[in-house]
C-alpha cells in the first residue's frame, strides 16, 4: 500500500486542517499510510506587510505546488480562498470536502456589536474586501490593517488599540475556538464572504489516479458546485487580494445562486449582483460581466493604479 505524502503550511490552522482531512479519509475507508510534510511559503515569511502590497493570492500556495510538481508531496490541503483562480497545468482541485460556515465574524471588545460600536472605533482586518464592506455600512468606523494567525489577532485585540477585529468563522470552527470568544456572525447580505471562504481545497496531480481515488472519499458535490460558480466569477474579473471582491454561492436542488461584489477600498462605491442558474460556470461569468459593465471595471482599474 502506497504511503501518501501530504504537504501543509506550518501554521496552526493549516496543520489542524491537514490532520482533519487525513483523519476523515481514514474514517471513510482509506487504508494508506499518510505523512505530513511541513512547507514554509512566502506568505508565512511576510508577517508585517499588508498582503495586497506583496503579491496577493498565491503567496500561500506556490512553494507547495512546486513540491507537488517535483513529486516531493502527493497532495496538499489549502483554504480555498488562498488558491489563485489559475493553477499550474499539471495540478487540479481534486477534492472539496463539505463546506463549513462561510460567514465573516466580528469580535468586539466590551460586548459591542456591529450596530453599537462607538463612532471612531478601530476595526482590524487583513482583507480589503472586509474593510471596504465595513466602511460602506459604517463609514464612521476606522479600518487598520492587522496580520498574523487567528491566535495572534485575538491577542492583538486584547493588547493593542483595536476595538474589534474581523475573522472568517471557518477558521474559528476548525480550531475549535467558537466557544473561546464572543463573536457576531455577519450575514452575507451585510458582508459578502471571500470566494471559497469555508471551503477546503485539496490539490493534487492530474496524472495521479491513485491519490484522486482516495480523495474522492471526501468530495462533496454541493460544495464543489458553489465553489465552481464563485471561482469562475473570480477568474472572469481577474480578482486577487489587491482588490475588494467578494463572491458567495448557495445551492438549492439544481439551482445555484451567486452574489458577486466589487467595491472601492474606501467603501464609497459598492456594486452587488445576485443571479441564479443551473450552470455554475455560466453563472459566474454572467455575474462578473454584469458587475464589470455596471462600473466594476472602473473601480478595479482605480484600485490597481
Curated annotation (Swiss-Prot):
Domain of life: Bacteria
Modified residues (S-(dipyrrolylmethanemethyl)cysteine): 241
Gene3D superfamilies, per database record: Periplasmic binding protein-like II, Porphobilinogen deaminase, C-terminal domain
Involved pathway(s): Porphyrin-containing compound metabolism; protoporphyrin-IX biosynthesis; coproporphyrinogen-III from 5-aminolevulinate: step 2/4
GO cellular component: cytoplasm
Enzyme Commission (EC) number: 2.5.1.61
Biological-process GO terms, alphabetical: protoporphyrinogen IX biosynthetic process
Details of cofactor binding: Binds 1 dipyrromethane group covalently.
One example GO MF annotation: hydroxymethylbilane synthase activity
Entry keyword set: Porphyrin biosynthesis, Transferase
Family: Belongs to the HMBS family.
Protein name per UniProt: Porphobilinogen deaminase
Lineage of producing organism: Bacteria, Bacillati, Bacillota, Bacilli, Bacillales
